[in-house]
Structure formats: structure tokens, C-alpha cells
Amino acid sequence: MDPNNAAASSAHDLSSLDLSCLNEAERIVINSFMRGPHAHFEHLGVGPNVKWDENLSKRAFYHLVAINHATLKLLVAQARLCSMQQMNAPNLTNGASATALGSLHPFSLGNPATSVTMASNPLANGPGLRTQLMAPDFALALLGNGTTPHASAGLGALNPGLYNPSASILGGPSSSGASSVLPSPSAHTPDAATDANHLPNPDPASGRQELTRAGRPARKKMKATALDAALRTEMPNWPSVQDDFVRWTRLAWFEAGFASTISDGAIGVQTRRPFSPFLTTTFAQVGVHLPSMSPNLLRAFNSWVDMHLRSLRDHFKGRIDKPHAGKASLAARSLEDTTFVSLTEFINNMCNSYNLINSELSVAAVRALCKLYLNVRNMATAKDSEGVLRVHIRDASNRQPPNILRGTLPQDREDDDLLTLITECGAIDFDLPTDTSDTMALAVLMVMSTSATTLTLDQAGCFSSLSGAASAQVNLLTNVTCEWFSVTMVTESGTSTISLPSSTRPSAHISAHGKDFALSWPKITEGLEIDIGLTLELQHNVTLDAYELRAKVVNHRPKAKASLWQLELNLRNVRQPEDGSAFFPAGYGVRYQGAFAASGSYPSSGATMQWMAAGGGAANEGQGLYLAAHDGYGYIKFLNAAAVEDVASLSIVYLVEDAGLPFAESTMPFPLTLAVVGGGDDLWYQAAQMYRTFALGEAQWMQAGRLHQRQDIPGWYVNNSIWINSGWQCHDIFNETQGDPHTVLNVTRRIRERFNTNMALHWYEWQQGPDANASARYRFDTHYPDYLPPRGGDYFGTVVRELEKEGVHIFPYINGRIFDVASTSYAQHNGSDHCCRKANPSFGAADQSFYVESYGSGSTFHTADPTDIYWQTTLADTVDALVNTYGVEGVYIDQLAAAAPTPDWTSWHNHTKGGGFYWRTGIVDIIKAMRQRVGPTVPLVTESNSEPYMDAISGFLTLVAFEPAFVGTKALVPAFPAIYGGYFVGFGDIFNAEDLADQDPLMARVVAQFVYGAQLGWFSLGGVTSGPDVDTSCGKMGEYDLWMSESSDAIVAAVEYYGNLRVCLLEYLAHGRILAPPSLSPAPAEFMAVETAVQNAGPFPSAMSAVWLHEDEASAVIIVAGVLDAGQTYNVSVDLTFSLPSLHDRQVTVQEMSCDGLSQQLDVMPANDIQIYDVTLSDRNARVYRVHFGA
């Protein structure tokens, strides 16, 4: 029988049905059937490409067809009954009507008047299954008889609560307290009278149904039905095991119609679910919750599943325990009577015993049998073996080398048997203890295995090993790691942090395919006055080939004074050898070697992204751990990483929404993702590509598109190469002339002429305030958010327009985050109402106070709530005036992406309290408010490159990104442009006056900006250069006179050269993305700055290099850039397949290019072995080589 035809033939003629009596989920089921069987399976979450001979076995596909055939029968019957009632049809009280409806009952595949068998059903090939399953009276029991107050509701009459395992299979109370809706005797077929004593009579007065046998509940009556008779026939001891049977089937893990969960104590563990996951998946896919389904319909589903799991349940449930008195278990018989020569024979024997066809077993069933086989074999050989048998098997295609064994194997294990295990079992991975013959003590370790990562947990849920596909022999963990997840609770008594797994063993469940698992602690708060449960799920992400951890905390006593504060995943004991490294996402990214400690609040300059990595080195065969929060909405969180003596730890802390407030349930709204990645010295790059896959696919901030797709990134802005600022000092030390319009006009004109290129001016100290007296001027970091009018009044606008005519684009400074408590606006607009309040961990988060900040100016600030409408409007007013009144082309709004969020617990603020993603949405709304005033084409930029603001912010001042050294044990790596290249604009670094006196460090900073794709400069023109106010920690910033000196001619020419080269390579450096770096031989020499009163004193490399991919991914450029004015020669080696695996086995064309349009072809080379010899650099120049990938 063709399954497609079977499903299609069951659809009947539905066009005349009245579907008004069906609920939403039921109408979806019928409508999907009308579209055809494959459309229906798509609704079921199976997918449109399901075929019996591909990813589903024929047996599983028939199960789906039969289940949905039964569903359709039920729904059609309900709709037709509704149609009859609406046509004033007589009550269904005669045999003919009953027979008519009986023909529609769910399991009647043939003549309704005859007993139904499953002989024609290819699924019913288990022993003894050719027996009557359902009689018409049972169908009427499902549908209602039309004579009770509930009958008009049909299948929807019963209480839509969850199934009660202690009730009968179809029993359960109604919403009015009545028993299940059962037909009256007159609704039976002619032999119904013999069954009359089993049926309740309606009591119109009470609306309840009475029982005709004293005190016997409705579920006992059902044992006299044909269904119960079938169960008795199949299982003579059914009365004694019914409750256990029903309970077990509710716990069964159901995959495509085949049971593959094994009971606790044998080869797996159980999970508690009110309905089979098949039903959950079925209706979750169409957006319908199970409680909205008719309870009888759900129960019919589950009853059908129960019956077809029966034979499998006999096989799996408790069959590996010790023999019980009076009967021998399957496991005992296997050990005593059978010698299993190979896994194949074992599987064949099991299939023959239960009439299962080996070739049609689902993958999950094969894996389950493999696990059972190993248990049996292990018990038979345990007395002769010691240690632990560890079996690591690759994916179903066996793409990796068959490196299977680790540890001690049973002596009789044969090589051909192991190869059979690979073939039959596919991608499974598990450990079995072989040091005991006590089968009840066998505790299978939970092991999740993908083609890239194998993660092993012991019986307590502790991480015991973490290894990658490159070598199963390498364990990235130095020790077993327990207490890797913690929950921080607050009560009236104080704060408690519970770390798990600990001595409290969880209940656990492994999925059928062996790649997902769940740990549950019903109560983690022993010894406390609260009752809190925790569930952790690790699920395999197929796209990323990684594991995603999800957490759910339940408060079983919501009225108790207890609340949740934060959740933390802390992976300790990560092996980081001396030659290994770690990555932390500050700025563009920092690579650490050796001991270190780093932390950052996300989103901020200290944690611009949400991922870390650690490991690498020869001992790890280049592999490391990737840990990330794959959160596409930007929830507030905290990242921490450290390493001591070759052991690293990585942790992510999630501040929960409404932290400290009463709660019933809290689910982490994003997964924490962990995986093993390769990469060796460039471990950071491979980890970055995994994060890039997530970000491009799920992150909200990617929706604005690439640079050329955005209106707020005009062409002149992308093409800009050099930035200057009017004068800035890191400790707010300014002289009087730095922001004066007359001074700014004069010095900017001359610098523009000196560099002979367009540039952007970041203008500080432009504000005056309402008092025109110089002594009353609003100085830097005072009076925020009050700025206007500007210094010089209308003359400020005149200077702006004059400079813009000469090719200088003006970006005045404002602050978007802090509120001066001494400002006029704070006093006039109840400033405290618009500011954030912090809370110490406490129940109710009642202990609140303002965040207080102060900088070099001495003013006191509170942090404004970015979601506050007043704050958004006030900032938009200022930007409106600057653009539309004074003519600036862009505005710099400080701190938005640099400063850490200040979680807010103010009760009347319109966002979640404490945790949440409101910080991102608030800042995005600030920018939206500004754009409503100035239009979409004005660049609005801020400090630092925090990812979640990319869709709103036009560019980022990258001071923090370029703060680390470029080589050494704490070095900048361009992870951010490796992920987001082509989607953002970065500009700027801190340059000191000392850098111009010692020109090589300045040139190193400029070259770093160039090779990493940023716009150059941010040279500070004004500043205090002498006297007691000179900044001795950050260095002198006033550089104008030095730039204009003849002694700087060479360095000016070099900066101009790299600025022009950047414009020439914009299609790569701005619109493309950076790849893994090339290798230079010999390694460039390193040097330190002569002057040390600067933030980055080195070490600096004498040359830097990079590979950039074009946006169309058809070519790349290899850049080698000189820092020193002395000659240097290098050989360059590039393996493009490391970054672009699609180029494997490809030949590429390499040519040296120049910006004058001339190029010289070098050779055709393998993409994985590009060699360019004798690359000579002189006079701080660069060599550029274009690589064409070809067809």
C-alpha cells in the first residue's frame, strides 16, 4: 500500500463539512489534509521532503500516515455530527445512526459493522496484534451521543486539562465534574444491550453522570470495551500493570512512530511529559498549544500510540534488570542462553523476536539496540575486564577515521565487530563501566556527539570530557568539571547561590538520536524555605554543529518570598597549554597567551560581542572551546575569562528579567552555545566564523543590511579616510581655544591642506549655553543634556559651512547617556524621574539608589534611562538644531556603545526590571527619534563598536579596539571585522604628541588601522602641551604644531599614502571582510615606543599583513604593509582554504596590483598553498596582491 495514497484516500469529501464546531488546531489538520499528504506532514513538523525510503523508515512513515488517518476520521466525524445538529437532525439514538457514525471512528479502516483487525496494516506485524482494536460504541464514546448536556460539544466537551495517568486511557473528569462522555445503550449496535450495565445514565438534574455499578469509577467501565479486551488479549497481566503501562507510555520518547527511550537503570533515562513529544511537535509547528485541542482527540492519539508501543515497551522497559521471581527477563535470557558473536546477529535476533524488519528500523531504534547490545556484552565480560570501555563512533557516513577505542576493551571484542558497530549504529558515543557485574549499578554516561564535538557527562551531570572531531584522544578538560551552572536566588533572608551539578543527582534524559539531553533537579534549594526547580537542556544545533544549553527555573511556591537574580554557566578546567591562547571580545577582540584575567559587561566596549574561546596549542592538537551566548536581541549579561597555569575558565552570567521580583517561572531567553573548534594559532578566527554564522542568521542588528544598502551610510562618509578632532584629553583637560570656532576654522583649514585629502572633524567644546559670557560657558562634561546655543552663535554655523565647502565633514560632540544633576534640565524636568536606579540583590529589589558617575570636569552625573521618552526627545532636539539650523553633516553621540548598561529597577519605567534587552532597544529608539528630525542620510556615530547597535549607529570610534598591543601575550586580533566586515564603519585611535616625536609607533598605529579596515587618524589638534595641566598618564594630545613642522613631512606623506591606498581598496577594506592572517617569513621584528607616557607603548611589529575578501567572494587581496622607513623583505604564505573551505582543491590566479590600474600576474597556485616570495618593503609602503578564485 502506498502511504501517500493511504493518507489521500482518507480525506473524503470535506467540502460540504461545517467546520465551525472544530477548534483552530482541528481545522488546521483537516485543511492540511485537503492540500495533500505531504502538505499535512509539513504541518506536522516532519517537513515537506519526508519520504519512506530516505530520512524516515517505511515503518515510521506508515505510523505517521495511520496516526493522521485516525485523526482525520475523528475530525470528519465531529464536523459531520455538528452539521447534522445544525440541520435539526434527530438525536442519534437508533442503531442505524450509530452505525453511520461508527463508520467514522478512528480505527475503522474497513466495514464498520465488522470487527476491525490490523491484518492489512503493515505496522501490525508484532505477535498477536491481529485483534479487534475498536468497536463502534467506542467511537461514539469519543464523539458524544447527542443526548447529554455535553454532546453538542462533541470532542471538545471534556476538560482541556492535561492527561491524568491514573485515569483510564480515555477517561477523566469533564469541566462540569462529569465523567467521560459515553453513549447511552440505545446508541449501540444490536449487541449493545449485553453491555448495558457498563454504561452510565445521565442525571439531568445534576448535570452529572451516575455509575450503574456501585462506586466503580468510569475508568473501570472502560475495561469492558473492545479496546480493553484487546489489551487483555495482548497482555494477560494487563490489570496489574495498567497504571505502570500508562505512566510509562506518557514518559516515552517518541520519534517518528518508533520508541527508542529506555528505562532508568538500563540504558537511558526517562523524562516526564504529559503527552508524547510527537503531539507536542505536531501542534507546536502550526502554532497551536496542546490545551486548545479536544481532550478526547488527544487521548485517542495517545491510546493509539500506547498500543503500538506495547511490544517495544515489553522489549525495552526494565528488561536489563536482574531476573525477577517467576519470570526471566530478556537480559537474563540473553546472558544465559545466547552467545552473540556480533552486533549484527544481536540486532537480527531482536528483530526476529518482535517481527521487526531489520532494514526498516529507524536510526534511533538501531542506536537503542546498539546500546542494549553493549550493555549485554559488557555484563557478560565484566568479570574479565577492568577500567572503562569508551566507544567513540563517527557520523553515519563514517567521514572521520575509525578511531574507536580508548581505554580497556573486553578481551573478546573483535575488530570486525567494531566495524559492524560503526556501520549499524552511526553517530553514537557513550561510555560503559566494565568494573562491575551488578547490572543494577550500570549507569550509562550521557554523551552527546556531533561530527565536530563530543561532550561527556557522568552520572551526576558533571562534564568529564570534551573533545573534537580532529582527535577523540584529546580531552580539552583537565579535570572532571562539576558545579558548572549556578542559580542565584534572593529571599528575605539574603542571597544564595546554588551551583550544580553537585551532590544532588539530577533526573536525566537522553534523546533518541543521542545528541540532546536534559538534566532536571525538582528541588535545588534544600535547606532553604523556598522550593525551586531547575532544568538544563543541551540540544544539538545542526547548522552550527554545536551544543546549545537552555535553562529553566521553576518556583513551585510562587507565593513564597523568593526571587531569581542571575544564572551563570562557568566552564572551568579548560586546557590551555603554554603555546595555546584565549580570546576575549573587548574592542575588536583580544588574544591572550599565558595567565590573564578579563571581564566585560555586554553590550559595551569591554564586551562588544558575546563569545569567548580558549585552548589551542600542540597538546590540544590546535583545538579549543568556543563558548557564546547566541542572543540576537542583546540581553544584558556579563562575560568573564581567566587562565592560570595552563588552565582557563570561561563564564557567562545572565541577569534575569525582573531580577529580585516574585516569579513563577523563568526561562533563559537565548541559548548558551559551546563547541570544539580548530584553528591552531588562529583559534580565534575559527571561533569567530561560528559566531558569524549565528549573527548573520539570527541577530536583530543585521537586519539593516550591508553598508551599500543603508541610507545612513552615504558615499562621502564611507570614502572618508582621515579623522581629526579639535582637541581631546582623556582626563577632560582642555584649554580655552580648543573648541573656539575661529581657532577650529584656522587650524582645520591648514591641516586639510597639509594632508591634501578630505577628512572628518570631531568637534569638542563647541557648546556655549544660554549665557554668552566666556566664564559661564558650558565646558566639556558639564550641564548635559544642555548645549545650546553654540559658541559664537550663528558664527558657529558659518564655520561649519565654510569647512564643509573645503572638504571637511563636521561631527559635533554630544553625550547620549549621562544627566548632569546640576543642569537646568535636571532641575526643571524632574531629572531623577528619568534616570536609572540600581538595586542590590534583595527580594523585591527594594534597596535602590542612583548610579553616580564623575569625570575630570568634577560634575556629578546620573545615568539616564535610554527608553525614557523625555530623554529621547531632548537628545533629538539637540541633533535637530545642529543639523537643520547649523548645517553639520553628522553628529557624534558619546558613550552609547562604549559604556556598560546600568540595569534599571525604577518601578515606573517602561521596561523589564534589571535584566532584559531594553538597553539595546532604548538606544535604537534614541537614534530613531533623531532620524525623525534629520532624515535618514545623516551619519550618527558613537564610541566603540558594540554589535547590537550596528543597525542604528552609522559608525564607531574604535579607541578601545586599538588599545591593545598588536603582538605579544595580549594582542589585538581583528575578530570584529572578520565577523561584521562590510556591515560597519570603524574609525580612530588615540595618538599622542610623543608619537610624532618618535614616528615609528605612530606609523604602527596608522598601519594597524589600515590593515584592519578602519578609517585613519583621529589626530588631536588642540590640547595642553605644557605646564602643570599636562596629562602625564595618557600623554600630550595637542599635535597641531608637530603636524605642521617640516620634520613631519615624511610621516605626513606616509599617512596620506595609506589614506589614498585605503580608498583604492574600499571594495575590500570597507565592503568586504577580513580573513585569517597570512604568514610572514621571517617574522617581523618588534620594537617598543621610546616614550612610554602613552596608552599603547608596544610592542609593535615592523610590518603587518592581512587578507581581505571581496563582497562578491570572487577575489581577495593579500596586503603586506611596512611600518619602518627601512627596507624589509618577506616571503608570504597563505592558505585560503582555512578561511574559505569551498576553495578546497581549487587553483587561483595571483597578481600584484597597484592603484594606477597596472597589475602584474605572478602565477596560478593552489588555494591552500599560495606562496609569494621576496616581497620587499621600503619607505613605509605596502604591497598588494589580488587573488582571483575563477570559475
Curated annotation (Swiss-Prot):
<keyword id="KW-0326">Glycosidase</keyword>
<feature type="compositionally biased region" description="Low complexity">
    <location>
        <begin position="173"/>
        <end position="187"/>
    </location>
</feature>
<dbReference type="InterPro" id="IPR046226">
    <property type="entry name" value="DUF6259"/>
</dbReference>
<protein>
    <recommendedName>
        <fullName>Putative glycoside hydrolase 22789</fullName>
        <ecNumber>3.2.1.-</ecNumber>
    </recommendedName>
</protein>
<dbReference type="GO" id="GO:0016798">
    <property type="term" value="F:hydrolase activity, acting on glycosyl bonds"/>
</dbReference>
<dbReference type="Pfam" id="PF19773">
    <property type="entry name" value="DUF6259"/>
</dbReference>
<keyword id="KW-0378">Hydrolase</keyword>
<feature type="region of interest" description="Disordered">
    <location>
        <begin position="173"/>
        <end position="221"/>
    </location>
</feature>
<comment type="similarity">
    <text>Belongs to the glycoside hydrolase-like 3 (GHL3) family.</text>
</comment>
